Every structure is written in C-alpha cells, then in structure tokens.
Amino acid sequence: MNRLAGKRALVTGAAQGIGRATVELFLREGAEVIALDVQAEALATLAGCRTKVVDLLDAVVVDALGTEVGTIDVLVNCAGYVDAGDLLSTEERGYRLSFDLNVDAAMRMIRTFLPGMIAAGGGSIVNVASVAGAMIGVPERFAYCVSKGALGGLTRSVAVDYVRHGVRCNAICPGTVQSPSLDQRLAATGDAEAARAAFIARQPMGRIGTAEEIAALALYLASDESSYITGSLMAIDGGWTMA
C-alpha cells in the first residue's frame, strides 16, 4: 500500500479496461488521480478521483490541460484504437484514426505535461503500446501494428531526450487482455467463441491476460521502485513473444 503516496497521476482511456484498472490500483496505492476519457457515462462511475470528459483528438483541448490540471508526477497514456485489416483492406479513416489516437494523442499529452515534470525535477510517463507492432507483426492488424510500433519509437525518443531531466518514459506492451473492447472485437467476428479460442491458443500460458495484471506493471513503472528503468518496452503477454 501507499506505493504512490504523494504523487499526482493522470490516466487517459480511464473509463474501462486497462485504464480503469490502473486508476483503481493507483488510488489504492495512495495517488491523487485525474481520470480522462471520452465515454462520459462510464467515466462517471469511477469513485475517489477527479474525472474529466476529454476528446483526445482535439489538440486545442489537450494543449489546455496543462494549465487546468497543473503539474503531475505520472502520466499514463492508455487511450487507444484497434483497427482491423491488412494493408490493402485498411481504409484511410481507420489508418488515420489509429495514428491520431495511438500516437498523436500520446505525443500531445506528453508535450503538455513534460515541461511541468522537468521543472519539478522528474516524472514517469507510461505508454500503453502492444506486442503487436512494437515487437511482432500480427495478421489483420496493419494500422494498429504500425501505430503501436510508432508509439514504441516515441517512448524511446522521449526517454533518451529527457533522461537527464529526471523524466522516465517506458511502454507496456500487452498481449491479448480481457476488456470490454476485446469483447466488442470478438463479437464483430460473427463467432465470438471461436475468435476467443483462437486468441487463447496463441498465448503459451493458455489464457488471456487481465486488465489488473497490466495495471500492476503500470504501478511498478509509475512508482519509485522502477527509478532505474527508462526507454524500455516491456512485454506482458503470457509468453506470446518469448519464442
């Protein structure tokens, strides 16, 4: 308990899944949390933290958050979008949205809060990427892989540029994780049971991960326990990428 006592943390994509689990764990560990999401109804069910409905695709709104929120110690960029299809079937809209949310929104959030971290003498940035794109290629996930690979590059670039300012930047790369988003994608296949079985089959541990397991890694990277870690892309994938 109290591993984040005295720290202010901001989490995007906070209404459900990994983001929500991260908010709840951070609160239990003593952090003051600001939770952001575009889903107002789900966000409103979070208790014990400050919530704000924000469209991260609106650059003007994101740029203004620094003044509104103030200095933070921890930034978790968890908001994301999963687009399906290979290169030839991917539509321009899905490709652009993948970059707008998976890369550009994270970049703007970092750009907004980084000066405050530098002035304070340090901070921790945690980007939620994926093994898809950042570590391996995954079929029918072209835009997702390309954008999450770019997020890995963003992570390392920020880490190397600001390490001497005491700012750490790392990325979590999950495998398949149970979440409302996963359920929606499974349902969209037309045979959710078969799709789930296929996802489980590619995990050597024989199961899908939980949002709470990913949140536990986010907690470690947000805390001072990981003070010697920066620029790392950490797989948490049930052994998917170990071969």
What is the predicted role of each segment?
Residues D86-L87, E91-F99, F199:
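Substrate-binding pocket helix/loop in short-chain dehydrogenase/reductase
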Residues S130:
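Residue(s) in the substrate-gating loop at a strand-loop-helix junction
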Residues I110, S147, T155:
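Active-site helix of classical SDR
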Residues V163, R168, I229-G231:
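Short, small/polar-rich loop/turn modules that mediate ligand/substrate recognition or access, typified
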Residues P115, V160-D161, S227:
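Alpha-helical segment proximal to the catalytic Tyr-Lys
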Residues M135, L219, T230-A243:
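Short C-terminal tail/terminal secondary-structure segment
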Residues P174-Q184:
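Short, flexible catalytic-loop segment of classical short-chain dehydrogenase/reductase
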